[in-house]
C-alpha cells in the first residue's frame, strides 16, 4: 500500500468506500497491475465487520448459549441455568472482536498491495474526470462507488420525538433494557428480537403484515408460533 503522500494524484481506478465491496474491488484491480485510490471516510471495514454480521452474530451466539442452558430441562435428568451477569462485559468483548478482525482483515492487508493508495481525508465528491477529496482532485478514468448503506428511520409521525435505536445502536447499549418494541418483522428485526428476548428483555415485534414477509406464509406462521 502506498500512503497518501504520493506525488501524483492520477490513478487507473478510484474506489469510493473502504468496506468489503470496495476493498475487494481495489485488491482485485491491484492484482491486475492497476493503480488504485481507495477512498475511505471514517472507520475502515464497512458494515459487516463493524456494525453488521460480526457484532450481531457475536451477540446472537451469546444469546444462544443462554438459551441452550435454560432449555436443558427438555431432557430427563438435566437442568441448566444461565443469565446475563454482566452486559457491559459482553458488549466490550464484542467490540474487542470487531476491532481485532477489522485490523487483521482490512488494515493489515493493505500494506501488501503496492498499487493501492488509501485516502481518508473526508467525504468524497464526484467531479468530471475523477473524485475530489480533501480539497484536491483525484483523477481516474473509472470510479467505483461502494459507499454501502445505513439504517433508515421510518417516516412515522412523532418518531423523532422519542428515544429510538437501530440495529447498530442496539448492540452498543451500556445497559440491558428491560423491554423493547421492534418495528419491522424482517429477518434483521426478528433475529435481534429473539436475541434480546433470550437475554431476558421483554420484546414486542410490531409489523405491518406478517413476520418475514418475503418468506412463504407457512414459514411466517410457524415462526410466529415459536416466538410466542
Features from the language model and the residues they span:
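Rossmann-like NAD(P)H-binding beta-loop-alpha module
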Residues: 174-215
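Beta1/beta-strand and adjacent pyrophosphate-binding region of the FAD-binding site
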Residues: 7-19, 176-183
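Flexible, active-site-proximal loop/turn residues at the rims of small-molecule/cofactor binding pockets
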Residues: 20, 149, 186
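Detector for methionine-enriched segments
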Residues: 1, 59, 195-199
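Glycine-rich flavin
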Residues: 2-11, 27-34, 39-176, 209-213, ...
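N-terminal Rossmann-like FAD-binding beta1-loop-alpha1 element of flavoenzymes
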Residues: 11-38, 189-198
Amino acid at each position: 500500500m502506498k500512503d497518501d503522500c504520493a506525488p501524483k494524484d492520477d490513478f487507473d481506478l478510484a474506489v469510493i468506500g473502504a468496506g468489503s465491496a470496495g476493498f475487494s474491488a481495489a485488491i482485485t484491480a491491484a492484482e491486475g497491475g492497476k493503480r488504485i485510490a481507495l477512498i475511505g471516510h471514517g472507520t475502515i471495514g464497512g458494515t459487516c465487520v463493524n456494525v453488521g454480521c460480526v457484532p450481531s452474530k457475536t451477540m446472537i451466539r451469546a444469546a444462544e448459549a443462554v438459551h441452550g442452558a435454560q432449555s436443558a430441562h427438555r431432557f430427563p435428568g438435566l437442568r441448566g441455568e444461565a443469565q446475563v451477569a454482566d452486559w457491559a462485559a459482553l458488549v466490550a468483548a464484542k467490540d474487542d472482536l470487531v476491532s481485532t478482525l477489522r485490523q487483521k482483515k482490512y488494515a493489515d492487508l493493505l500494506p501488501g498491495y503496492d498499487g493501492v493508495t488509501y485516502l481518508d481525508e473526508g467525504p468524497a465528491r464526484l467531479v468530471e474526470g475523477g473524485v475530489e477529496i480533501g480539497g484536491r482532485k483525484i483523477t481516474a478514468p473509472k470510479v467505483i462507488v461502494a459507499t454501502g448503506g445505513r439504517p433508515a428511520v421510518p417516516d412515522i409521525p412523532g418518531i423523532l420525538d422519542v428515544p429510538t435505536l437501530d440495529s447498530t445502536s442496539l448492540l452498543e447499549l451500556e445497559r440491558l433494557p428491560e423491554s423493547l418494541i421492534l418495528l419491522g418483522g424482517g429477518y434483521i428485526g426478528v433475529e435481534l428480537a429473539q436475541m434480546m428476548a433470550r437475554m431476558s428483555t421483554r420484546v414486542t415485534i410490531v409489523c405491518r403484515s406478517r413476520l418475514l414477509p418475503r418468506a412463504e406464509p407457512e414459514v411466517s406462521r410457524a415462526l410466529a408460533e415459536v416466538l410466542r
